[in-house]
């Protein structure tokens, strides 16, 4: 993907007095009383918004929340206004809609440096259909388009892709820029040796990532539930562990591919097994070759942690996507936590550490090491598709640098 123009190239002359439509990702978790339980995504959007405010723009923020079918009050963005106002240091104005005359009046009434939050853009089915008429109505609110919502960049929706056709310039926000620099940069031009750690429960969701990474990595470490499909493909007995029977041939071919490309593919040599899938299950450590019937593997074992650790010590760039075990249960979190701690330590020694979205982000946050990593991706699906080498519609729509 070509390099895209960044919001940082727009100066006061380009921005003062202009309305700027900013697609942000404010899809934060709310509890039953509409309190924000994790404001990471809101905080991540602040640098771009503050830059635009500081240059005298009228900022129009657009986001989705959840997957509403039509107008659904529980998916309103209103509960986000107090936190957003607090972080930005201005009183954010809330619109009751995302298009139309009323909204246009609110935009016109904003002072320079003022901020308006549109209501959930997915209240309109046209958003996800990328309806050009709807995109035009969104574009009618502004002069400039900034996409800072990396988490939805893999979707061609009206607010992420369609609107860019009607507004020039269309540029990447600072968060989007950082995501692209790290994720595209790591895959296209990593400092070697380059390792990828891929975990998670299913091989099927990570096939594309593994295949793509086999072209660039020197070392590939596999963990999580997917390892049992690889074990079974090698003829090992896996007890009651999770296996994707229809992916056994694929697992074999991935191991052969790694060998042919000279990639060091490491599978755990020991596992922590449990007699049931529960936080209070009985557990024991066994070699990967000796999983008894009726037991299931829920984490990688201490020998594997040591082997993985020694392999990672040799590297200069590491991408991590997916946990090593069922880290939600404390008893089976040791593997994932050990990887998080080691990556934090290596970051301190100058290794580039990239946490590629999804559950690994939650794992790193659980251990309290998020701020120690070089880059934590805010996108789940978008990070995966980028690592798979797929073009992202929300990025392609932006102006070339």
From Swiss-Prot:
Tissue-by-tissue expression: Expressed in roots, leaves and inflorescence.
Residues holding AMP: 202, 206, 225, 297, 328
Gene (UniProt): PGK3
SUPFAM superfamilies: Phosphoglycerate kinase (SSF53748)
GO annotation, cellular component aspect: apoplast; chloroplast stroma; cytosol; mitochondrion; nucleus; plant-type vacuole; plasma membrane; plasmodesma
Induction or repression: Repressed by glucose-hexokinase treatment. Induced by heat stress (e.g. 37 degrees Celsius). Accumulates in response to 3-oxo-octanoyl-homoserine lactone treatment (3OC8-HSL), a bacterial quorum-sensing signal. Regulated by light.
Protein name: Phosphoglycerate kinase 3, cytosolic
EC identifiers of the protein: 2.7.2.3
UniProt keyword annotations, A-Z: ATP-binding, Cytoplasm, Glycolysis, Kinase, Magnesium, Metal-binding, Nucleotide-binding, Transferase
